[in-house]
């Protein structure tokens, strides 16, 4: 049996990424969706049952994680726990699960490196989309942009001008570029992180405006090392720009956070691209696109605090099955 715990963002896709391979591997599944967005999982279960899935194969439980998590994770019938969410919860699951297989994606602080030969016409909109779609509530969202000194002024002006044209509003409006945060509590947290960075010397280039749970896309520079925006996962519509003098410095700064999910580099040089591929300590390096580039056929996961194991159709199926050796002596 597989225990699957999913986050509030992309609730249908996240459930499908876990339920599909688990069922394909012959497992029963107990799915615990985020309490803020449970309806997608319930609709998925209904559609599968109406399509002929045998009773008991997919079981959806809803409620607060604090109340349901202990029972799900510690139950001896659950042989694998697959979880997408925060590091604290992931560490808690690791302690409670005992000797079980675990597959966990625990977040990121995704860096993008922009080198002097980068095509800024391509880089600027791609980075902005990767940073501010879903109000940054995406584990692959861009959080840090490491820009070479030689093009920093040009890039920052273009980037801020592009962000100024983004439309903030309701996610039900198809013209909206940046939607609201999932809750007032999360908006409070993101606002406090921006305030901390500003108090310690960061400069706001655009944004730092709030209306209810809507935080306008915010871009900062001179963010000091060690503040939360610099080294933790913001999970909000905030990007920090950094000057770097070389590719080597950019890679070193990209690697100094405790996460390693996705990173990206914009360059026309294959030599520089492969240097980044070899030296960035992450699960995926995206060349000339945003960190949020992903296809379901790709192995998805990271290094360090970004988690354990890999998702993606074939790779998740491998995680959710056991290898058995059978020998016949005839």
Predicted regions mapped to residue ranges:
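Rossmann-like NAD(P) dinucleotide-binding subdomain of oxidoreductase/dehydrogenase enzymes
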Residues: 1-122, 244
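A short hydrophobic/small-residue beta-strand
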Residues: 28-30, 204, 284
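Hydrophobic packing residues within well-ordered alpha-helices of enzyme cores
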Residues: 41-44, 72, 93, 155, ...
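Short helix-capping segments at alpha-helix termini
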Residues: 50-54, 166, 170, 227
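Short hydrophobic/charged patches on amphipathic alpha-helices used for structural packing
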Residues: 69-70, 124, 251, 274
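Conserved C-terminal structural/oligomerization subdomain of aldehyde/semialdehyde dehydrogenase
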Residues: 78, 113, 167, 194, ...
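ALDH superfamily catalytic-core signature
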Residues: 80, 88-224, 287
């Amino acid at each position: 049996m597989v225990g699957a715990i999913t986050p509030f963002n992309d609730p249908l896709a996240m459930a499908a990424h876990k339920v599909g391979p688990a069922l394909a591997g012959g497992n029963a599944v107990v799915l615990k969706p985020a309490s803020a967005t449970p309806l997608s999982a319930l609709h998925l279960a209904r559609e599968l049952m109406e399509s002929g899935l045998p009773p008991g194969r997919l079981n959806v439980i809803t409620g607060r994680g604090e109340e349901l998590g202990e029972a799900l994770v510690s139950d001896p019938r659950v042989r694998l726990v697959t979880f997408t969410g925060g590091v604290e919860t992931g560490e808690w699951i690791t302690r409670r699960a005992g000797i079980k297989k675990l597959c966990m994606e625990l977040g990121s602080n995704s860096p993008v490196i922009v080198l002097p030969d980068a095509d800024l016409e391509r880089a600027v909109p791609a980075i902005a989309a990767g940073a501010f779609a879903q109000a940054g509530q995406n584990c692959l969202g861009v959080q840090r942009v490491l820009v070479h000194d030689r093009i920093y002024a040009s890039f920052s002006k273009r980037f801020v001008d592009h962000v100024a044209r983004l439309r903030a509003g309701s996610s039900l409006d198809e013209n909206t570029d940046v939607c609201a945060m999932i809750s007032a509590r999360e908006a409070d947290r993101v606002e406090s992180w921006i305030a901390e960075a500003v108090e310690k010397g960061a400069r706001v280039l655009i944004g730092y405006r709030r209306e209810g749970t809507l935080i306008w896309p915010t871009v900062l520079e001179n963010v000091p090392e060690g503040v939360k925006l610099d080294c933790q996962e913001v999970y909000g519509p905030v990007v920090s720009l950094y000057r770097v003098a070389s590719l080597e410095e950019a890679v070193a700064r990209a690697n100094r956070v405790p996460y390693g999910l996705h990173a990206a580099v914009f360059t026309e040089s294959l030599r520089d691209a492969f240097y980044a591929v070899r030296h960035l300590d992450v699960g995926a390096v995206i060349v000339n696109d945003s960190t949020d580039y992903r296809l379901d056929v790709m192995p998805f996961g990271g290094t360090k605090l970004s988690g354990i194991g890999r998702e993606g159709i074939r790779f998740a199926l491998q995680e959710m099955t056991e290898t058995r050796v059978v020998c016949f002596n005839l």
